[in-house]
Amino acid sequence: MSENYDSSSIKVLKGLDAVRKRPGMYIGDTDDGTGLHHMVFEVVDNSIDEALAGHCKDIVVTIHEDNSVSVSDDGRGIPTEMHPEEKVSAAEVIMTVLHAGGKFDDNSYKVSGGLHGVGVSVVNALSEKVVLTIHRGGHIHTQTYRHGEPEAPLAVVGDTDKTGTQIRFWPSAETFSNTEFHYDILAKRLRELSFLNSGVSIKLIDEREADKQDHFMYEGGIQAFVQHLNTNKTPIIEKIFHFDLEREDGISVEVAMQWNDGFQENIFCFTNNIPQRDGGTHLAGFRAALTRTLNSFMDKEGFSKKAKTATSGDDAREGLTAVVSVKVPDPKFSSQTKDKLVSSEVKSAVESAMGEKLSEFLVENPSEAKMVCSKIIDAARAREAARKAREMTRRKGALDLAGLPGKLADCQEKDPALSELYIVEGDSAGGSAKQGRNRKNQAILPLKGKILNVEKARFDKMLSSQEVATLITALGCGIGRDEYNPDKLRYHNIIIMTDADVDGSHIRTLLLTFFYRQMPELIERGYVYIAQPPLYKVKKGKQEQYIKDEEAMNQYQVSLALDNASLHVNAEAPALAGEALEKLVQQYNAGIKLADRMSRRYPRALVHELIYTSRLTAEQCHDAAAVEAWTKQLVEQLNAKEVGASQYSYEVELHAELGLSLPKIIVRTHGVTHEHALSVDFLNSKEYGKLADLSEVLDGLLEEGAYIKRGERTLPVSSFAEALEWLVKESMRGLSRQRYKGLGEMNPDQLWETTMDPETRRMMQVTIEDAVGADQLFTTLMGDQVEPRRHFIEENALKVANLDV
């Protein structure tokens, strides 16, 4: 360490170096996927700002096959003129200078989103490559950046009569530990944005899978959002309460809400289109006005007198779905990620607007007002009944925390952070778990049968369920709005351990429904896990081994197959064995698995045949004859191997503007024709690169007289696939394989060793990435309405390997 601390010790990070040095400050976590997806949102927010200013109608977000993302819009296009101070094009300034852009000039954008206020320059800094295309002033301008540095100045490459911007970026693997984009995370945010910006069309296209795209365009704005949130639920009143008010101080307040016959409160808050997960002053204002207005209306109309029970704000919000969206010129948030709004002036703005408009709505719609008041009174009565039920059970002593439920085998550890609670299905598995556990920090709670489906049950009915009451007591954090306190939780590791059969899956789903609906904070804090007991036990001779899943089973079979095996590529060649053969098998299996994954988008036979076809590079596509020869060879191989009803033909498409010829494979099956074009993105993708690498390894590997040997047995082979298949078949001789259905099939030692020992066990942590999606999924799968559930099963049945209905 340097002894001198002087002016030379002070480092000034110039330009975008600061972003690359500390990416988390600018974009969020670079390991868990949040930062990666924020890259897309930063670019989309620029297009949304154009839409807010009235210049943009269509936004298209595309996840390309090479895992790059492009965002294009039909806005005004980023200015291309020279910047007076920076002496480069304005577009280059926006791409390379932090905090540059139109948001800081109040005349360009009145309110703007942008999650971290740093914009597209951060995306540029954290990408291996960015291609910027601008349609503006009758010209198409383009510029390419690598790691934030422009390769050349902005150049004109053609003429156009359109306007708009397209930014395509390849995230840097040096910054992000995982560069795989999740469609659902992008879809959730883009859906929100389309609701919040009525009339803007947002398309999301995933080129990695066939026909996977969504078109989000909602004319109804946040009214349509509420309608969407209440899909598969039964509204109490058909009419959606809605107002949009712009105040003189520049704050605009928009609220939409509707009650349904459920028991959950669903309120989503936004400031300048940015979601606040933890609410803030706008939520406080909304809640205060809702409670005050409804209470005074019920007093005035005599509902409170008839009810004979006092109503609270919680009763008013039972079954309420609401979206609160405020536009604030200079919002203040509690942190950089803007999860909570702290601008004090917003509370009074929302409260006064909401109070005034809700009063008008109740007076002008007496029949709807009556239905809402009846629902609130019902909620108050149920709350009162639940309170009495709790008091009754307390008096009996069953729910008194001094006496924990008799079934619970508690642990000695008193620190919740170190304690684990295993929720086990059935008494037999419970017995094994109690004997096999580590008493110091592992508690066991066996549950008998299936617990109540809390999605369909009211609170008082839920409390009267014996299994639910046992679970609540064991957890120790109480339940219900008055008593629930997640900080009092007795175990910070709650592990659901059920059998690997249909009943086990059902019980696990019922438990997850309970946690999601009644104790969502436990999931949000990462306390809920699902145990992953082994699926198989294999026995060969006297050796026994546990195998966790199908993939591990395949790996085990391969390792067994390679034992004492050797491949001879011709009659005279030395044996290929040991590590060299293992490496080849691993590469082959990885290629086959990759081809299976790619066959979601392309025909399975086509993708698998690429493993046996020479590589076609993007550069070769400038030579039409080379593309013709490659495509012809591929199609001939496909037709030669086809045993079904499919016929293959091809075309070579000329893309004159790019100077490229690209292959198109045509598949005709039972008179139906499908065309599959192989794009430049496909040829440049990592996936195709891996298949082509494998094809180069296999090409010419086996010659005349090649054979495979295992022990003393041999077989002449003509392909590597044939050799591997024979090896696996040979290795399975004398092997018994037992599939575990229930945890009770294991003795205590086996259960400890495979599922409960912290050194060797595997667990899945339960998380919620898309709150709206999770809510809808629980409503569809666990709610009262049968039709949406049937539709869900029909749509997804083919995606499952083992379906039991």
UniProtKB/Swiss-Prot annotation:
A GO cellular component annotation in the UniProt record: cytoplasm
UniProt main location, coarse: cytoplasm
Pfam families: DNA_gyraseB, DNA_gyraseB_C, GyrB_hook, GyrB_insert, HATPase_c, Toprim
Cofactor(s) required, per the database record: Mg(2+); Mn(2+); Ca(2+)
Positions bound to Mg(2+) 2: D499, D501
Chain coiled-coil ranges: none
Enzyme class of the recorded protein, top EC level: isomerase
UniProt: Mg(2+) 1 binding residues: E425, D499
Additional observations: Few gyrases are as efficient as E.coli at forming negative supercoils. Not all organisms have 2 type II topoisomerases; in organisms with a single type II topoisomerase this enzyme also has to decatenate newly replicated chromosomes.
Known function: A type II topoisomerase that negatively supercoils closed circular double-stranded (ds) DNA in an ATP-dependent manner to modulate DNA topology and maintain chromosomes in an underwound state. Negative supercoiling favors strand separation, and DNA replication, transcription, recombination and repair, all of which involve strand separation. Also able to catalyze the interconversion of other topological isomers of dsDNA rings, including catenanes and knotted rings. Type II topoisomerases break and join 2 DNA strands simultaneously in an ATP-dependent manner.
The protein, known as: DNA gyrase subunit B
Biological source species: Vibrio parahaemolyticus serotype O3:K6 (strain RIMD 2210633)
Gene: gyrB
